Swiss-Prot record:
Feature: compositional bias, Low complexity: 11-24
GO molecular function, one term: DNA binding
UniProt cross-references to InterPro entries, sorted A to Z: Histone-fold (IPR009072), Histone_H2A/H2B/H3 (IPR007125), Histone_H2B (IPR000558), HISTONE_H2B_site (IPR055333)
Pfam hit, one: Histone
Top-level lineage group: Eukaryota
Protein name: Histone H2B.2
Keywords in alphabetical order: Acetylation, Chromosome, DNA-binding, Isopeptide bond, Nucleosome core, Nucleus, Phosphoprotein, Ubl conjugation
Homology family: Belongs to the histone H2B family.
Compartment list: Nucleus; Chromosome
Phosphoserine modified-residue sites: S11
Alphabetized PANTHER family for the sequence: HISTONE H2B
Major place of residence: nucleus
Length: 127
């Protein structure tokens, strides 16, 4: 066998120095904002059960659930608008999508609460 060659430690080159301050400012990363429903879920929890808390894992699961339902309703409403050759999703498409996606009694309650919310919003904007 041939003798092993001796390895010398690799010499490091000195780091290049920055000459201008503008390169520091342009390379500064901004933290991307992630929008969640956490604050709204927490407010509803405190309205219904004031002395109850919620873990981060549970909050994450509920946030995923709300995002999923939102996606389903939005896509169904989009399809309904396309079927009727409309480019705008109105309250009617949302209401029909909710009736199609949510089962039975849950759909009835969701529609009544949604109607109530839209009525409340409409009256507050006109006044």
């Amino acid at each position: 066998m041939a003798p092993k060659a001796e390895k010398k430690p690799a010499s490091k080159a000195p780091a290049a120095k920055k000459t201008t301050a503008s390169t520091d400012a342009s390379k500064k990363r901004t933290k991307t904002r992630k929008e969640t429903y956490s604050s709204y879920i927490y407010k509803v929890l405190k309205q219904t059960h004031p002395d109850t808390g919620i873990s981060q894992k549970s909050m994450s699961i509920l946030n995923s659930f709300v995002n999923d339902i939102f996606e389903r309703i939005a896509s169904e409403a989009s399809k309904l608008a396309a079927y009727n050759k409309k480019s705008t999703i109105s309250a009617r498409e949302i209401q029909t999508a909710v009736r199609l996606i949510l089962p039975g009694e849950l759909a009835k309650h969701a529609v009544s609460e949604g109607t109530r919310a839209v009525t409340k919003y409409s009256s507050s904007t006109q006044a």
